[in-house]
């Protein structure tokens, strides 16, 4: 299964996410993440090495190869054929992880206020967890456990 992550798609997610984040912070009258317009104009300067590092670390168990093209990265994951239908949501999760990783790096580099760093960090972790769970779900069907035998039927709290 090939997962293609295009930088332009990731930047689009970053732009929209930052706009939403700033609106929420503005409503709460809290400091915002500034300088995003300049950031999106100069996204070529972003050090993508860290972004790919986060992604590949999350995927290393399933990744068979990685190739960096012009403005994109292609991950080849070893997944059974029956999961190819789930490729689109998985691809979107990768883009979200990339976007929120960039936002984390950008916020840290530009000494964003603590409240902004916290929100970004939480959101980045949500997507990273989602990615790990998505990949783990591809491993195999869940192991069926035998139902536990009830030892003392009188002690069951029947509601």
Name what the model sees in each region.
Residues 28-34, 109-117:
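Charged, low-complexity interaction regions
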């Amino acid at each position: 299964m090939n997962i293609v992550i295009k930088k332009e798609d990731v930047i689009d997610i970053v732009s929209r996410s930052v706009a939403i984040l700033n609106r929420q912070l503005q409503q709460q009258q809290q400091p915002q993440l500034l300088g995003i317009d300049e950031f999106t104009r100069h996204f070529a300067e972003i050090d993508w090495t860290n972004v790919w590092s986060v992604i590949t670390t999350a995927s290393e168990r399933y990744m068979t190869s990685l190739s960096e093209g012009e403005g994109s990265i292609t991950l080849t994951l070893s997944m059974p054929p029956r999961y190819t239908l789930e490729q689109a949501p998985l691809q979107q999760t990768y883009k979200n992880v990339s976007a929120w990783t960039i936002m984390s790096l950008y916020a840290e580099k530009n000494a964003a206020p603590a409240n902004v760093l916290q929100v970004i960090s939480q959101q980045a972790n949500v997507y990273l967890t989602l990615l790990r769970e998505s990949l783990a779900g591809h491993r195999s069907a869940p192991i069926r456990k035998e139902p536990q035998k009830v030892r003392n039927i009188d002690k069951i709290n029947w509601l």
